[in-house]
Amino acid sequence: LREGGFSAGFTWDDFIQDLVSTEGTLTAVAEKLCAARKWEEDVGSVERALRRLRSRGQMAGGKWGSRTLAVFGLPGGVRARLRWMGAYHSRFTDLPVSVCQDLVRLWDHPPTTERREDRVWLALARTTIALRQNDFAAARTELERAEPDLTVAPEEARIEAALAHAFMASRTAPADVAALLERVPPLLLHVTGGEDRACLLARYIDQRAYALGTIDGGTQDGAAREKLYRQIPTKGAPPFALCRRANGLAYALWKQGRRQEAAAHAREAARHAGDGGHVRMRAMALAMLARIEQGPEAEDARVRATSIGQRLEDE
């Protein structure tokens, strides 16, 4: 819990200390802040304000907390941790639900919650936790509360929200899924991070494919799903995306009666999940293999998938 040199109990003192380490001295931090504010205040006054700010612990930072964050932002390691918790395709979701809840609580305070573009990731993390508990009402509440923050959030966060809305609709209002997923492609155009983009694309395609089985009585299943899953790129793709592709193909081929090919893809999905350390994805792949295969291998896969789910506290 000390990635980037910060404990989970990140405080204003930690924030100021990071700025001092970067700029050299507290005076240098104050000078940079003064310059950004067009010298509305003198350096001495700002330096004293920063000394008061670093004693605020995890309380609201007031005007100087807001001003300092506006100029410098949170440290890169802290921002990365918040994004990690908010991304469904990260290994945050491979932790037991109770551990995920503890981690979110440990970061859910100032200074990490002072800016909208930072705290939105905590809302997304809480949404994922609620979905893992099959608590759609709580997930919707989190997303509704996050709407104002999403307007200034990066594209990745807005895609996360759109995919969460579409996932819930696929279980409760299938006719709404297509419109919800239409929000994703324009946002994906602006996602430049290779691994994040690959995972988000794989999740988008996966949800489009799932929707095919919920409309017209499922008549658009099988071959149409296979065509979609084959659109997920494989060259240089991270294990998460490769697992989603293989598991999706396993189901699509199984629906077409191609059981041996389907089982091979399910085994491939389990292998990719293991390579990436994605425990939940491995459970899904094993569950798929249990549906496709017969006999001892199917029973073994079913038992292993169930055991993983219990250990992760998934509903």
List PLM regions with ranges.
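A short, Lys/Arg-rich alpha-helix, primarily the initiator
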Residues: 1-38
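Helix-turn-helix repeat elements of alpha-solenoid scaffolds
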Residues: 23, 90-108, 128-147, 170-188, ...
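Long, ordered, amphipathic alpha-helical scaffolds
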Residues: 29, 239-240, 250-252, 257-315
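Recognition helix of helix-turn-helix/homeodomain-like DNA-binding domains
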Residues: 34-60
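DNA major-groove recognition helix of helix-turn-helix/homeodomain DNA-binding modules
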Residues: 58-78
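A structural signal for repeat-array scaffolds
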Residues: 76-85, 89, 106-114
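Tandem amphipathic alpha-helical repeat scaffolds
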Residues: 85-95, 120-135, 157-174, 198-217, ...
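Short coil/turn linkers that connect adjacent helices within long alpha-helical scaffolds
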Residues: 111-115, 150-154, 190-195, 232-239, ...
